[in-house]
């Protein structure tokens, strides 16, 4: 039964101990390193000899491996043989209509698309997904989670979810559907303002976005543009560059910087120019991650866009699969993404230019207070005010989402 947690808690505790032991050992030369490794050995021996139930050594070691790598960031993981299949390949066409981010080793829903299967099933931001297709989500990286919740159109997606409002477990089954948009939506929440909401940055085609923006500008004039990147997560920084191009940027975009070896440069492609308003703003929070953070950083540097809302998640490196000699793989971030000017958001995220204060929202039924605050600020002329600093968790709404750094 999935309700039985004692062995998994034991593995998690041991994973924490070995993670701390190995990390501390790596930071101390010579004899001092053994002091930290001895902690692991002592816990290992005490567990094997005294735990009330029989303990599988293989399970303990695998839990330690998973905990150690998962503690690095939201895109790194230890993968047992077979788990690597398709993990870095493009997601399937079917979608349930929600986005996940790992937070404190738990998968948290950070966006639910209106009219989607997820919305019809009553899922909300802040809900925790405990199991996907019978598999626990604990210690899963974002690429693994993305792969698990996408697939062929019409496929069933079985979930065990902790309702973030009522704190009760739900078992539900969704049918994956073809997305109704191209990874973005355009609307006008206030007169004279165009909001571009990026839902899936890794699905956006730059040329299609440029055509849609051009048509919107031809329909009615606008004095400002708000790019809404909340709940947007991805790892394709080339797509981020294409989105920036659709908004009028061009030239150097990003650099992929490995720990050693040559860098790779990613330029923003040239697209036909669009006469967009000069007043540009980007709405972000702690659910803005990966390629969405790359886009926000580029728009601030290249187009003088002002970031508002809450500080971002801090997923600023790209993973690759590294085979292990005895089987399995490491999914490990090996290249940090920085802008042409050297801006990085790995671990700490991007600090906003204007932090927006809102009332505490209980959920989607209470509207969108952060968007309302952004619209009011823009309507007031976007007055200057230094950001008040990062939040206690370094993140924004929904509550409970934090970076894995």
Language-model features, listed with the residues they occupy:
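Extended, small/polar residue-biased N-terminal targeting/export presequences
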Residues: 49-108, 143, 154-158, 162-186, ...
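Cleft-lining beta-strand/loop regions that shape enzyme active-site pockets
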Residues: 26-27, 31-36, 56, 110, ...
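Short, Lys/Arg-rich N-terminal segment immediately upstream of the first membrane anchor
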Residues: 1-5
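Mature N-terminal segment immediately following signal peptide/propeptide cleavage
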Residues: 36-48
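Low-complexity, Gly/Ser/Thr/Pro-rich intrinsically disordered linker/tail segments
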Residues: 363-387, 392-394
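PDZ/PDZ-like domain segments forming the peptide/carboxylate-binding groove
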Residues: 91-131, 135-139, 203-206, 335-336
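Generic structural signal for buried aliphatic residues
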Residues: 129-130, 157, 330, 345
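Hydrophobic membrane-insertion alpha-helices, especially the h-region
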Residues: 8-25
